[in-house]
Amino acid sequence: MADQHLHIVSFDVPSPPNYGGVIDVFYKVKALSELGVKVQLHCFQYGRPKAKELESLCVSVHYYPRHTGKHQLFNSLPYVVLSRRSEALVERLLQDEYPILFEGLHSCYYLGDHRLQGRLRLVRAHNVEHDYYTALAKAEGNAFRRTYFINEARKLQRFEPVLSEADHVLAISPKDEAYFSGHFRSVKHIPAFHACDKVEVPDGLSDFAFYHGALGVAENDQAALYLVRKVFKDLPVKLVIAGSFASGELKREIARAKNVELRENIGTEEIHRLVRQAQVNVLPTFQATGIKLKLLLCLYTGRHVVCNTPMVEGTGLAELCHVHDSPEAMRTSIISCIGKPANGQAIELRARVLEERFSNRRNAEAIVRLLR
């Protein structure tokens, strides 16, 4: 059988895989490579260096600078799309007839380009982007950034019909699949790719709860503040919060709390170690969009997971978590989990559900079938 080649256009450099979107891209590239797919990776670059590790997974890796001038905010196209354009990218794509996978609506500037007519084109939909940006606006305290998110949400909704140019739209969650199927043809649910091969939950007990996230993102800042102020206030359980770029407000709240510790700007390996060591991974969110990759990490490698409904909404994973929507119920659940090993039927169910639905290899094989 002839080699299967695939161009992947990524919105960012996907290594190191240390935040939601790039985790999906990195482990997708890895899984496809392990199946023998010859991946030609194209990355838009801003703030993240070139990554040597990608060269061992791909036959070629190309980098393109993002055009980040503020004057582009006044264009009718979304800033996140307009800033990811490069004639050098198109020229490389035109050198052969291989299929193209565009990662996210952000990278779809050339999806409808007449020069790519006739090519097999796929889009990985990481979110319903206008919903995601609307939720970011609601969580944002800074007036300028809130206005930016509102405008960007409107532009992304207007731009979204470009997905009709794709031969296949790969939705990341069942909820997103239902949305995109109402607007576009050939929509398929391909679950998120992630770092874990099998469910491995530590034995024994620990004595702390853990929350992690990119704290500079308003959604995560809001979740961390909720935990410190509402859930862990005067709770006889230690909470460790890890992430980068914590807000001044969050730092002040943590300084006042005797049972909360901040671990800032630590590496991915240390995050993974804390997920495994914690007795409870607490994962509130106020944004029910896509699927949170940190939820998968915690279910594969952590003990108990306590979260709220938006974290699991539309994912099919609610039965694997302790789901509570009030601070009081969350507090009670955390105290219950602190004294209880994570084992038995609950972990067997986790293994059955996750290894059936979130197998990187099986989901990569589903993508390969679409390329033929």
Show which residues each predicted segment covers:
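Short N-terminal targeting/anchoring amphipathic segment
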Residues: E91-Y109, L120-L122
